[in-house]
């Protein structure tokens, strides 16, 4: 029998999964629809498509882990699932970093030569960083795959894969998150400085007038700030999720930490939708029609 607490956690996990599934699905469909309408990929559409696609995968990986972990705790394929999970998580972080670079390039207004040089080469530098990340992670993944086929001898972790050495390699693979996170923080910091500088100029020259650029700054910072908070929750919950799977596993702790982790791909999709007026209006219309249809049909 499931306890009341575990049942509640399972309900929250299902709700988060549905929110993430619908939210990221809407963003993927919108990106494709924009491409079909214009027959031209914009940088923003590509970033949103990649970000939503990675979040969609991440949501499925979390729900698969929660569903199958109690049944296949000692299965070898769950080890590879954990490695794939890390790679998808890092890809999601890279696309969020590209989004912060996009906001920084489009919104910030500095006139310093170093900034103008960096602004012109922002996408190229980001793509080179992504290529370097891909090569390093490919080498680490091959090394980890070989270790899974030749595990340390005389260790009980062969029987219980979540006990010790495998996740040391998963943590090593996860160290690739530092570079995109640093780029993300630098881009967000430049947005904050740009907003502060712009606010000072507006106070002097155009007090009382509608400030569209300041609104764009604030909207971008809200989205990036929420992402940073949710990503930090995700990072802090990950080690506890791993340690709760050590033998004997604590199923309640696994659900607590992975439910916190699932908030990252599900809730940020809603924040992105709220920041895209056309998608927001479409979702509001669909929701309103659903409510009206339910009222017409009755209970």
Swiss-Prot record:
Task: Give residue spans on the Cytoplasmic membrane side.
Answer: 23-45, 104-127, 197-223, 275-299
What does the record say about its membrane topology? Multi-pass membrane protein
What's in the GO CC field?
Answer: membrane; plasma membrane
What GO biological process, any one, is recorded here? detection of chemical stimulus involved in sensory perception of bitter taste
Glycosylation is annotated at 155
Annotated Pfam families = TAS2R
Query: Transmembrane among the record's keywords?
Result: yes
- Check the record and name the InterPro entries matching this protein: TAS2R
User: What other comment is given for this protein?
Assistant: Most taste cells may be activated by a limited number of bitter compounds; individual taste cells can discriminate among bitter stimuli.
What protein name does the entry list? Taste receptor type 2 member 5
Give the organism the record lists.
Answer: Gorilla gorilla gorilla
